[in-house]
Amino acid sequence: MLLFDRDGEYWVILNKRTQKVEHHKGEICFPGGRKDMLDKDLTETALRETWEEMGVDPSNVSVLGILGKTETTTGYEITPTVGLISYPYQFNIHNDEVEEVIEMPLSCLFLKDTRRYEAKLLEGEVIVQPAFHYENNMIFGATARILNNFACLIDSRNLEEPA
């Protein structure tokens, strides 16, 4: 999870995936991917994947910490690493993987117009989970759960519960 400070407000970087990728085509996500055998830990994996997908030099990222694990419906386990980069940053995206870079203010995680709760049928059970709508993009699934967990760490008092 890449963050940056723009005029005293923190923003998060998200990617819109292309239609060329194998999984989660067109979905909004964080840069990231699978751990390689050469990666010494998951932080190194996050930095390597961010370099490969977005051209963000690992030396330009100040790692702030690691969030709790989140599972996807496709069986992946995500361990989000939070890092800070300077703004503006000149991204060099991998066009086969990233269609668009989305910059979203963290304040959107707390706004009624942005924050939703979506019901989804999963293996015969209705699951209600957070989703975020920002600039004609719907952020849902594991990405929305990670953002929601991060918002709770920032300030849970400003979050609304589902009706």
Regions found by a protein language model. Give the residues of each.
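Buried hydrophobic packing segments
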Residues: 2-3, 143, 147-150
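Unchanged
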Residues: 20, 34-135, 139, 149-163
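Gly/Ser/Thr-rich helix-start
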Residues: 27, 33-34, 142
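N-terminal strand-loop-strand
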Residues: 1-30
